[in-house]
Amino acid sequence: MIFETFGNKQNPAILFFHAMGVTGASSEPVVRYLQDRYFCILPTSTVYCAGQKYRGKTDEVRQVEVFLRAQGVERLALVVASSIGAALAGAFRAQPGLSGEHVFFDGGQLAQIGKGPRRIMMPFLYLAIKSLYWSRGGTLKKILWCEDAAIKPYFIAAGKALTYGNLRRQLSDSLEEGAFLMLPEELQRHTYFAFGSIEEHFKYRDAVIKAYPYGNFPVFEEHQHMQYQIRDPKGFADMLCCIIEEDRLPELPFIRK
């Protein structure tokens, strides 16, 4: 993995797990509004690190824990997981220790897809992500709901480093069709599973609610996959601060709690 950090180590820490097809730097637009108050850690999965081999979620979690200890992090105020980053964040939070006082899952989290469909998806996902590098971001609109110039560099960097083997190994232990990881009731009460009302992954919401009955399940009305984070990083950062400092979501007209 590769790690970036922003802010003062003496401040409460926020750990970000990034989405599929991008690097950890994709959280930088949000972190820009947090780094004065929080110590922000942005790991990039080995899937998107040149010369590294993805060995599974357990190994990824181990690398994150080693880095946090080396940085002297004693408190994780918040863990933020975007899209498929939820699979890694879930494994991280299920471990004892620095699991995070609050967690915010943004979009498409904990999707359940069988092994057969995942095998079929593999070559298409690989070509889609690599095409973003080959086309310098020109194919983004074909695989995502937007083609904002601000996010293209993160897709391009990820596509450059991606290998077929790493993506195959990641999908083999992510998006599993099976029982979700258990979370204690108290942890669920401080966990937010957010969905955009018009994103394709909204169909997984009922299964997540059933698995974590004590959690929080805000719906971002008329929002696409990770739209608030991409289009309004300052607003998204302010929302994260509200979760940390007040243990609640802010009152926003498009959020249905």
Identify the meaning behind each predicted range.
Residues 91-131:
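Flexible "cap/lid" loop of the alpha/beta hydrolase fold
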